[in-house]
Amino acid sequence: MALYEMNLSVILFLIGILGFVLNRKNIILMLISIEVMLLAVTLLVLVSSYSFDDILGQTYSIYIIAIAGAESAIGLGILVAYYRLRGNISLRQ
């Protein structure tokens, strides 16, 4: 049963990598792709924790989600400062 969830996690991670590589112009889409990759890893940690009947993986996933939230807040703060400085958020001008 856990094999389906692990495959889903790998597919989500590959979608995140693909989104990051293909959207090199838009910073917001790059941040979203990084978040998708991080949440795919979190899903893999949760599934592995459930498979091995270990609660430590669940606590790690809570930490990963908290760090992802902080990373998103910092990234969006930097993005707002970049927009105020340059007037647009495009990487290529």
Curated annotation (Swiss-Prot):
<comment type="similarity">
    <text>Belongs to the complex I subunit 4L family.</text>
</comment>
<keyword id="KW-0496">Mitochondrion</keyword>
<dbReference type="GO" id="GO:0008137">
    <property type="term" value="F:NADH dehydrogenase (ubiquinone) activity"/>
</dbReference>
<feature type="transmembrane region" description="Helical">
    <location>
        <begin position="62"/>
        <end position="82"/>
    </location>
</feature>
<keyword id="KW-0999">Mitochondrion inner membrane</keyword>
<protein>
    <recommendedName>
        <fullName>NADH-ubiquinone oxidoreductase chain 4L</fullName>
        <ecNumber>7.1.1.2</ecNumber>
    </recommendedName>
</protein>
<keyword id="KW-1133">Transmembrane helix</keyword>
<dbReference type="GO" id="GO:0005743">
    <property type="term" value="C:mitochondrial inner membrane"/>
</dbReference>
<feature type="transmembrane region" description="Helical">
    <location>
        <begin position="27"/>
        <end position="47"/>
    </location>
</feature>
<dbReference type="InterPro" id="IPR001133">
    <property type="entry name" value="NADH_UbQ_OxRdtase_chain4L/K"/>
</dbReference>
<keyword id="KW-0520">NAD</keyword>
<dbReference type="InterPro" id="IPR039428">
    <property type="entry name" value="NUOK/Mnh_C1-like"/>
</dbReference>
<keyword id="KW-0812">Transmembrane</keyword>
<keyword id="KW-0813">Transport</keyword>
<keyword id="KW-0472">Membrane</keyword>
<keyword id="KW-0249">Electron transport</keyword>
<dbReference type="GO" id="GO:0042773">
    <property type="term" value="P:ATP synthesis coupled electron transport"/>
</dbReference>
<keyword id="KW-0830">Ubiquinone</keyword>
<feature type="transmembrane region" description="Helical">
    <location>
        <begin position="2"/>
        <end position="22"/>
    </location>
</feature>
<dbReference type="Pfam" id="PF00420">
    <property type="entry name" value="Oxidored_q2"/>
</dbReference>
<keyword id="KW-1278">Translocase</keyword>
<comment type="function">
    <text>Core subunit of the mitochondrial membrane respiratory chain NADH dehydrogenase (Complex I) that is believed to belong to the minimal assembly required for catalysis. Complex I functions in the transfer of electrons from NADH to the respiratory chain. The immediate electron acceptor for the enzyme is believed to be ubiquinone.</text>
</comment>
<dbReference type="GO" id="GO:0045271">
    <property type="term" value="C:respiratory chain complex I"/>
</dbReference>
<keyword id="KW-0679">Respiratory chain</keyword>
